[in-house]
């Protein structure tokens, strides 16, 4: 199944909260997830000239602010992070409503999530819908939210999670066979001694 770019929020079997983001693409496969610093992961093209072909292929996909993780499929990552003082729900709702879906040929939804060790909110804005919802994370499970054929937040979109470290989860989600055309993956895990980030590419 092809669901395009997607995020996963959940907990490891040992109960560590995490957020993951995977680029799945048929149109722009030559991209990588690059750790820019201890708090930021960016999606960038391997050929920087491609940045000028499409405004939606280069962006920060994970941003860590103190003990909170923001994950999304576009430039709204940074704006959500800036609005965290609104609270998780309102930061998502405000930024998604203001920025709206991507104005490309596919009317691609913007998807996002915010989580810390205590709670998680997921949200999206599509051309015909907008939603923000608090979800209860379960050990060993992850909610996924994709831009194509999977842009909804419900119990039917839960997958098993394998791995305890950011590296293990990134490898698992990048190679998750049900979702086609993997390109790159980034993961942030909330551990007892801080938030750990890892990236993986094809």
UniProtKB/Swiss-Prot annotation:
The gene is purO. HAMAP family: IMP_cyclohydrol. It catalyses: IMP + H2O = 5-formamido-1-(5-phospho-D-ribosyl)imidazole-4-carboxamide. Belongs to the archaeal IMP cyclohydrolase family. Transmembrane segments: none annotated. Catalyzes the cyclization of 5-formylamidoimidazole-4-carboxamide ribonucleotide to IMP. Fully active at 80 degrees Celsius. Gradually loses some activity from 90 to 100 degrees Celsius. This is IMP cyclohydrolase. Keywords: Hydrolase, Purine biosynthesis. Its EC number is 3.5.4.10. It comes from Methanocaldococcus jannaschii (strain ATCC 43067 / DSM 2661 / JAL-1 / JCM 10045 / NBRC 100440) (Methanococcus jannaschii). One of its GO terms (molecular function) is IMP cyclohydrolase activity.
């Amino acid at each position: 199944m092809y669901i395009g770019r997607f995020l996963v929020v959940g907990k490891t079997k040992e109960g560590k909260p995490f957020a993951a983001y995977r680029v799945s693409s048929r149109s722009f496969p030559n991209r990588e997830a690059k750790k820019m610093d201890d708090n930021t992961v960016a999606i960038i093209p391997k050929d920087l000239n491609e940045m000028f072909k499409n405004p939606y292929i280069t962006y920060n996909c994970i941003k860590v602010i103190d003990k909170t993780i923001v994950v999304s499929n576009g430039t709204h990552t940074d704006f959500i992070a800036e609005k965290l003082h609104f609270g998780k729900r309102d930061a998502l709702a405000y930024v998604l409503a203001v920025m709206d879906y991507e104005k490309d040929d596919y009317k691609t939804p913007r998807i996002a999530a915010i989580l810390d060790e205590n709670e998680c909110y997921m949200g999206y804005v599509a051309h015909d819908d907008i939603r923000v919802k608090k979800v209860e994370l379960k050990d060993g499970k992850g909610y996924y939210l994709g831009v194509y054929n999977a842009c909804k937040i419900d119990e039917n979109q839960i997958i098993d999670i394998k791995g305890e470290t950011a590296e293990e989860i990134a490898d698992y989600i990048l190679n998750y066979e049900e979702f086609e055309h993997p390109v790159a993956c980034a993961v942030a895990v909330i551990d007892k001694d801080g938030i750990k980030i890892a990236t993986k590419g094809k």
